[in-house]
Each structure stands twice: as C-alpha cells, then as structure tokens.
Amino acid sequence: MALALSVAPTSSSLSSLLSRTPNPSPNFRTTHLNFGSQRRIYTINPLLRSFKCLQSSSRDVNASPFSISAIASSSSSSQTTELVPYKLQRLVKEFKSLTEPIDRLKWVLHYASLLPQMPESSKTESNRVMGCTARVWLDAELGQDGKMRFCADSDSDVSKGMCSCLIQVLDEASPVEVMELKTEDLAELNVGLLGGERSRVNTWYNVLVSMQKKTRRLVAEREGKVPSFEPFPSLVLTAHGIEAKGSFAQAQAKYLFPEESRVEELVNVLKEKKIGVVAHFYMDPEVQGVLTAAQKHWPHISISDSLVMADSAVTMAKAGCQFITVLGVDFMSENVRAILDQAGFEKVGVYRMSDETIGCSLADAASAPAYLNYLEAASRSPPSLHVVYINTSLETKAFAHELVPTITCTSSNVVQTILQAFAQMPELTVWYGPDSYMGANIVKLFQQMTLMTNEEIANIHPKHSLDSIKSLLPRLHYFQEGTCIVHHLFGHEVVERIKYMYCDAFLTAHLEVPGEMFSLAMEAKKREMGVVGSTQNILDFIKQKVQEAVDRNVDDHLQFVLGTESGMVTSIVAVIRSLLGSSANSKLKVEVVFPVSSDSMTKTSSDSSNSIKVGDVALPVVPGVAGGEGCSIHGGCASCPYMKMNSLSSLLKVCHKLPDLENVYGGFIAERFKRQTPQGKLIADVGCEPILHMRHFQANKELPDKLVHQVLSCESKR
C-alpha cells in the first residue's frame, strides 16, 4: 500500500520511492519516547495526505531530548519557516568559512555541546547506527503536527557533533523533506576534518540513512498500517552460540554441526584413497557442513569460487591426490579436467556427483544460437575482444575463441579486464557475455565513472581518464539474453523490502544480480556499507567488517544482507565464528540475513520454550514443515537447484567406489573433450586458451601479447 504522502510535482522521484513501501515487521513495535519525567504517547491516527505545518502549542524544550533546533537558533524551532535546503546551505557555509582542519574540528565539537542529552533508556540496540567507527544512537518521533524530531548521542564527541549538525538541518522537517535529502548533499561537509576522514564521512551518511529508515516506519505507523510480513530469515552469531530466525535459516543452521560419524567416514575414505575435493561456495549446506569439519583432518578439501577450483585441483594433484571429486556444475568439472591435463596430470581421475547433466542457466544461455549470432556480429566488427564469463562451458569458450579473440573473466576481475583491454587497444570494441545483469551493471558502473574526476578514475585504473571512459562506453556491448536463475530472484519485491527494513545494514551483492539490487549495494558501497563483486569479495568484505568490530571491542550488532546464493552461509559462518572465538568476552552480535520472497515464508514460533538445540544453535520449532526449508527456488529463495545435485550421499558413494575398476560410476567421470572445433582443433586445447589468457592478466596486470596480436590480426585481415 502506498504511504499517504502528498508531494509537490518536483518531488516525484521521492513519491515513487515511497509509493510501495512494505509494512514493518510485527517484531518492530511502536516505541513510546520519554520526555523528561513525562511519557508522551501518540495515538496511531491516519496522517493528513499532506504534511503541511500544523501550528501546535510550544514544547518545553528543556524536557525533551528532541529539541536541538530550539537550542541552536535564537527563535523557537516550532515557529521557523526555514526549508531544509536553506538550513543545509547555511551549515555548509559555516563549515567552509573555516579553512583550518583544527577550526573545523572545533566547530563540530561546538555542535556536539548543543545536542540535548539522550535518555539512557533510548540507547538501545535497535537505536544503534550501523557502520560508524564510534557507537552512535539515534531515536525519532513523528509529532502530531506532522513534523519529525530526532535525538542522538555518541561516545565520540566528533560523531556527536555530526549528529547534532544533521539534527539541526532535519529537526521539525516534514517526512518528505527528510526523505528528499540525499547522501550526496552532504559532500561539502566531508573535507578537512582531522584524522580518520573516511570513517568520519561515513558517519554523516549512515546517520542520515538511519534517520530516513525511522521516518519511513513512523509514517507507516501513523497511518495505522498493519505489518504484513516478517523480517527475512537470518542467523545471529555471538561468541557463545548461534540463533536461527525463520525456517530457511533453521534449515541452513542445522547442518553447521554435522554428525561426527559422517565427518569421520568421509575423512577416512579420502585419506585411504588419496582423494581431493573441490567444491563451490554454493553447495548444499549439508555437504558444506561436513566438508568444513573434515578440512581440519584432511588438507585436500577446498571450498571456493569457480576460478579457484581448478587451481586447487592442481595443487592437490601435486601433493599426491590420485582422484579429484568436483562438487559444482558441469562446466566446473570440465575446467578442472582441462586444467589438470594442461598441468600434466592426465592420470588423475576427475569425478562429478551425478550421472545426469548438472546444468547452469548461464552456461546454457552461452550455448544457445542467440549467443552464436551475437559473436558473429562481433567477428564482423574488428578489432573486437570477447570477454566471456568463466561460468560457461569449455566448448563455448573454444567455439567463441575461433570466432572472436576471447579472454575469460570472473565477477571479481571483469571490470579491470575490460579497462585494461581498452588501455592496451584504445580503438577496441568489447563484447561481454553471457550474463545480462552483470553486463548491464558493468555499463552502469562505467557510466557512474563519467561523474568522477580524473584523479578518482586513475585510482581505479591508472591508464584511464574521464575522456577515455566516455570514449569506450559506445564500444562496450553485452549479451542481453542470459541470466543466472539464482541472482534473478533479487528483483523488485526483495529490493523494496531491503530498502524498508535493511537500508542501514551492510549490503552484499554478487555482480550477477539485477540492476535494482546492484544500485542499492553500490549506494551502500559509497559509504563503506556494501560490496558488489564475486563470492570471494563478499566473504572478504564480511570478514573485514567483523574483524574491525572485534578489534574495537565494544558491544555492537552487525547485520549483513546476503545478496547471493544461500550456500555461501557455511563459509561465512565459519569465518565469523573463528573471529568471534578469538575474543571470548566479545559482546558482538553478527547477523546474516537471507533475502527471501514473501511467498516462501513460514511463520515460526516466538515462544523460546518451544525451541530445540543443535550444537550451540537455538532452533525455533517451525509449525507445519519443521524439517523443510520453508521456501523453494520457485518461491524466491536464493538457492541453486543445480548445485544441490551435489549431495553428501553422492560424494560418499563415489569415494567408496573409487578406483571404480568395474566402471559402475562411468557416468560420473568428467570426460575429456575429444570433439574438434570447426577449424579442426581439439576443444580442450582451444577452450583452455582464454583461461590461460586470464591467468596471464591476473599475474601480470596486462593482457598477453599473444591475445593482443590475435585481436589486431583480425583487424588487419579486414
């Protein structure tokens, strides 16, 4: 339902922002705010359709923490007619009039002294502002006159002063005015403070985002809207245990503590038969839980993204492993087989986990006739370079490379690959595929770079400038008919719920997600509250933020929204538990949130007496399907059905049967490509070359001469 906000025509963008805001969770109850000794309770009545200033009786500013405007100006704030932009302009003018950093710091500290004291009862976990180096609390109320009031506090005087400045601007503003202010509007307040400048910048931004989140909720409550959905399922980790919230989280959590007998069985057979295991992050949680536990007893187990899997297999072969089991989709086992052969380990057996095709929607898209047509168009436009996502078959890479010189990429190196290609060949045309969302996100990223300075662009790539970025954009193409079915699920509904409930949390997003989720995470990234990239980038980001919080050694609640396949949680939990375990006295809470479609939610019991324990995980009993995930791929859970074909039972069966002299599991073997390309070459040989080009780029930070020659040779033959 739309919020009952009536805005001027110039506020159409804000109107659309608030036009379909979901209702808050039942867990978020209306807070009655304390004003001195008097408790003021507002009834929940529908707001007027316009938040025009309604004159009300003067407040006792000495009795309320929501009174910064009255203290900071010579006249009563309830009588002011100043607009938010004018207040901000005046604040910026004050700030910029001070040229010395020490004077600006004193100015911020002066504002800190103006901030009314916040009641201790308001310094709650729900009022903490995430992403600030210091502890910051923010509370808000929506007055009966339709105006917002804020109060804040911090254990840092500098952060407190920043809060005071923002409250000076937004106190007694209408909800629309609060929502219209953007983080970019605060840019001129960012320069020249002493020490920790980047973290200080983030305080401005994160407090503003929290103000806007509270404003949304208060407006919804004032309109009398009944909450219509639960929070997304999540896992909450502390130094002392794990709590699973929601049925999907329950299903994930119950495998974090596998049966010792299963772990022992796997370790014994791996050791006995010298078997290595390479598995993708997106594995089923059951098999990941066992593999994670088994890693402590057998070193030749690797859980990683697709790029590292083949490298790990080579390392295992060098260490004496005679077999490699691959837990992933078919193009991953193909790559492992081909790279092992290239490294001279033809005798090492490679096994998949099924005798059926373990497909991938992206790999399938690259094998379709439409992709061949796309490449044929590229071949007619030399000099062209085909940048193909590593998540494609070896056959696709081989056929493509014969049509257009090709280099593979990953979600973590695709941007640098493209920038380097244009730097080495300025007249180049780049054709990326097959992931349409990633392609669109790359283009959007480069478009955002056109708003940067030359210095900022050079920090991303030293051989590029504003002119070169503008020049390359018309010559950057991407395939528009390929998507990952998992990341496709992060669409409009999920994004709207994240905006409403988790806009102040840390947001993570794989580069394959749709544009709305990409933009949301990119905005968070600007204030160091988000990451967009590969699965490994996401894992590293979470690890960094948790480590920083552990080092601060204060009570805190970090919340991460997992914008990729839910199978990542096993590796994430392992990293977080390791960091929290290093500080047994830590009061830190880390929450990992799984964005799930509302169609796939199952209500859980709120009665703690009905919970059960698995290891140190408290699992609520789920009414109905207690043993199920409570959601499915069709309902919108970020879970890949292809990856889930790699079960623990399959892994154990294959391992026990090896060396399979009777060929019982012949259908599980990752076969070598004996077929030839149209030019009569082996698919394995030609398909590996784009991968080797990428490896050269990663090692040397430039495209190999051989690839550059291939691209320019096509131009000379034109």
Swiss-Prot record:
EC class name: transferase
Functionally, this protein is described as follows:
Catalyzes the condensation of iminoaspartate with dihydroxyacetone phosphate to form quinolinate. Can complement nadA-deficient E.coli mutant. Essential for the de novo synthesis of NAD. Also participates in cysteine desulfurization mediated by NFS2. Can activate the cysteine desulfurase activity of NFS2 in vitro.
Q: Which residues bind iminosuccinate?
A: 280, 306, 389-391, 411, 510-512, 535
Which family does the UniProt entry place this protein in?
Belongs to the quinolinate synthase family. Type 1 subfamily.
Q: Which GO terms describe its molecular function?
A: 4 iron, 4 sulfur cluster binding; enzyme activator activity; metal ion binding; protein homodimerization activity; quinolinate synthetase A activity
UniProt key word Chloroplast: yes
Knockout consequence?
Embryonic lethality when homozygous.
Taxonomic placement? Eukaryota, Viridiplantae, Streptophyta, Embryophyta, Tracheophyta
How does this chain assemble? Homodimer. Interacts in vitro with NFS2, CpNIFS3 and AO. Part of a Cys defulfurase complex.
The EC number(s) this enzyme carries: 2.5.1.72
A GO cellular-component term linked to this record: chloroplast
Pathway given in the UniProt record: Cofactor biosynthesis; NAD(+) biosynthesis; quinolinate from iminoaspartate: step 1/1
What's the further remark here? Answer: The highly oxygen-sensitive (4Fe-4S) cluster at its NadA domain, can be reconstituted by its own SufE domain in the presence of NFS2, cysteine and ferrous iron.
Low complexity bias: start-end ranges: 1-22
Q: How is the cofactor bound?
A: Binds 1 [4Fe-4S] cluster per subunit.
Going by the UniProt record, its keywords in alphabetical order are: 4Fe-4S, Chloroplast, Iron, Iron-sulfur, Metal-binding, Plastid, Pyridine nucleotide biosynthesis, Transferase, Transit peptide
Entry protein name: Quinolinate synthase, chloroplastic
Gene behind this chain?
A: QS
- Locate the region Disordered: 1-29
Extract the Pfam families matched here.
NadA, SufE
| Localisation per UniProt entry | Plastid, Chloroplast
Coiled-coil regions, chain positions: none
